């Protein structure tokens, strides 16, 4: 079984090991990046719409550049308080980066 998108926790790690589940761990910050590197997990990296800002995007640029997959990215007009214009700009920049580096989203 494969989980296409999860966020790391000890509980999830235990279940994955117990049931032989593999997956793509979503990284949203440097601390999570260090964790997936230590655990040798396959991962994606992206600025989630809830955290969308140019500052966040700039701080995550090195992680995005080195990630095998760009994600979890997008836009959220229902559950998110971040202005849609900002979300759109951050989303588009991540798509442009993925295209320039030939990475899947």
Model-derived regions: residue spans:
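Mid-domain alpha/beta scaffold segments of enzyme catalytic cores
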Residues: 1-105
């Amino acid at each position: 079984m494969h989980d296409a998108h999860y966020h790391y926790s000890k509980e999830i790690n235990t279940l994955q090991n117990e049931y032989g589940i593999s997956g793509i761990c979503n990284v949203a910050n440097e601390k999570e990046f260090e964790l997936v590197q230590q655990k040798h997990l396959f991962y994606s990296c992206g600025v989630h719409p809830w955290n969308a800002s140019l500052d966040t995007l700039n701080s995550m640029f090195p992680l995005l550049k080195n990630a095998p997959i760009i994600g979890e990215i997008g836009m959220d007009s229902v559950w998110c308080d971040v202005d849609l214009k900002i979300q759109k700009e951050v989303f588009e920049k991540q798509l442009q980066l993925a295209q320039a580096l030939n990475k899947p989203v």
